[in-house]
Each structure stands twice: as structure tokens, then as C-alpha cells.
Amino acid sequence: MSTYAIGDIQGCYTELQNLLNEINFNEKNDQLWFAGDLVNRGPKSLQTLRFIKSLGVSAKIVLGNHDLHLIAASKNIRPISNKDTIKEILTADDADELINWLKSRPLLFTDTDLGFTMVHAGIAPQWTMDTAKNFAKECESILQNEKIDDFLMHMYGDTPNIWSDSIEGYARQRFIINCFTRIRFCTIDGALDLDIKVAPGSQKKSLIPWYALPNRKTIDNKIIFGHWSTIHFGVENNFKKYNVYPVDTGCLWGGQLTAMRLDDEKIFSVTSEQSKL
């Protein structure tokens, strides 16, 4: 049995199937970890979501920002833009089943036997892993209960941008969601900058990748994440010294779709079909 962590798919179903062929995926013996953003912007979001759901216990998923956008759009809380490719999901016969399944996925997943934790974007440098797990559960429980609509209506926004134990209510939950699904760069004091999406090393000097912040409290935890399609183009790519494993390699943007085998940390990649469009 092997376990593979796969980066952002965003509806690139053909590339996903090519990647599974590349790793000789065996549904009975292997397990797939998906680092969020299963859907949106790519051409086959509905097929992708149906397939991953069909994998059952062979798949572990964490929610990404595009997955949350789909959930919000399904409740008419967020508009669908011209760039979105989720309308086919919302009009599908099994839309409710798919959305309900997605809502029950976690924001953070840990396998203590394998020694890895997976999130979509990152973890606030000020948080311990136990703290991060508790905050993930806090928001996951809301996504799965009757308070979800109010939660989704208040989920969007860039403030507060720095953690404090005194933050309460929707502001607190918004910060938690932004860390798990949107974070890339921080200032030295841990304030989030959610606008900058460049490769590490190309940012202004006042910003630091979240995982490279001095005294990050999860430095001893192996963390898999996606979200950052440009991260491997940075001037520094020695991620292991930070104990992080970024698996988004920009498939949607004509890059690659990548899987890391957790057993030996070997990387497998296939070329994006989007580069041929």
C-alpha cells in the first residue's frame, strides 16, 4: 500500500487520470490525499468531484478556497463569475449529494502513523499543531450545521490579518479560514498579506513565506499543502528544511499535476493539458 498527496486539480480531470496511471494507482491498496481546490477554473469540475467522491475511503481531502466558493455559490451567497467552471456542478442531478459530501470534508487532516499533516494553504505561524487542529474543528463543525449560511456570508474578507486570542465570532473564524485556505506570505510579526501571489523571493522585502517565519510553532511537523502555484519558481526551493511539502505545481496554468508518495517522498508529475489549449 502507498499513499500519495496530490496538488490542486481545479477540475483538470484528464491530468488527474494521467497522474493516476503514472503512479499505477490501485484503489484497493493505495490511498490518495488531495490538498484542496478539487474544482473550478478547469474544464471538468463535475467529473473531478464525482470521481474523487467515488473513491470513498481511498481518498482523504481537505477543503480549499475554491471548494468553499462552490459551497457558498450553492447557497447563492457568492456570485458565479465568468472565470468559474462550477455551474455544471450546481445544475447536476446529484448537486445536493456532491455539495453535502464536500461540506463534510475537513480543513486539516493528520495521519499520525505516516507523520504528515495536510492543509490547503498553510497554518498561522503563531499556532501549535494542536491549536490548528482545534481551530479547524471549530470551523468544520459550522460548515456541517444550521449556522453555515451566516458563516459563509461573513467568511470573505482580508481582516483581521493578524492573530489574537481576543478575536471572537465571525472575525475569528474568517482569520482561521484565511490561514487554512489562502495564506502565502506574512510580515515578521505574523500579519497575513493575502494579495501577493508571486513566487518566494519575488515578494517585497517586508514579507516572508508563512512556513519560513522564525519561531514558527509547527516547524517540527511535516506539512503538505497546495494553493501556491508559483512556489516552485522561487529562488529558494529547499522546502525540507522548513518541514513543508508544497504539491501545487500549477496544472491549471499549464504547469504540471504532481503527486508525492509519502512513503519515500518521491515525486511524480504529468504535464498539464491546459498548456495545449
Give, region by region, the residue ranges found by the protein language model.
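Residue-level marker for buried hydrophobic side chains located in beta-strands
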Residues: A5, F34, I61-V62, T117, ...
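N-terminal active-site segment of His-dependent metallophosphoesterases
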Residues: M1-L55, L68
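Active-site-proximal beta-strand elements of phosphoester/diester hydrolases
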Residues: S2-Q10, F116-G122, P246-V247
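Acidic, His/Gly-rich catalytic cores of divalent-metal-dependent hydrolytic chemistry
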Residues: K133-L277
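Active-site environment of divalent metal-dependent phosphoester hydrolases
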Residues: C12-T14, N40-G42, H66-A72, Q126, ...
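Divalent metal-coordination and catalytic microenvironments
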Residues: D8, D37, G64-N65, L102, ...
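Active-site neighborhood of divalent metal-dependent phosphoester bond hydrolases
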Residues: L46-T48, S54-G169
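Short, basic, glycine/proline-bearing loop/turn elements
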Residues: Q31-G36, P79-L90, L192-A199
